[in-house]
Amino acid sequence: AKKGGNHVVLIDAGHFNPMESISDKLPSLLQFFPYVPLHVTRSMHWDSDHVVLFEDSIKDIAAEVVRCPEGMDKVLIGMDFFDATINRVAAMVIGARSTLKSLLLGMLSPIDTLKDAESTGDFTTRLAVTEEMKSYPFGAVWEFYCQQQNVPAGTEWLTEVKDYEQKIL
């Protein structure tokens, strides 16, 4: 991609080998490019096509975006849902919410503690904190965020989408 004379690398998560992680590429790319456009998607799956889900690969990408200096400002996140065999509105909602949840989870991590442990070679602390984070009450924070945004935290939105699908689509 090119913008204002700057060439940048577009990272399309859906076109990498499923065993390859793109999250480990972001820190390096952010050092050399003014911004990094990121196409967050999944390779084809039988159940949901390209719809972004709240899964490890997306959480890892979001964690790197949050942890990298200026990552939140320099990474441009885009998604698509045109291949979804499910309702397109539901695909958009599921994908957007999964991406937001992943970013929120990254923001809730004790980044300074992890960076200090990494820089001092204290890999025991880094591992212990990383494992402990997995049991943090993330769901309560997500529910509070949704409440603040006046949107349902659970699947209440699905009724509205199904009504729209039946009446409009």
Predicted segments, located by residue:
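Histidine-acidic metal/acid-base catalytic patches
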Residues: K2-I11, H15-L169
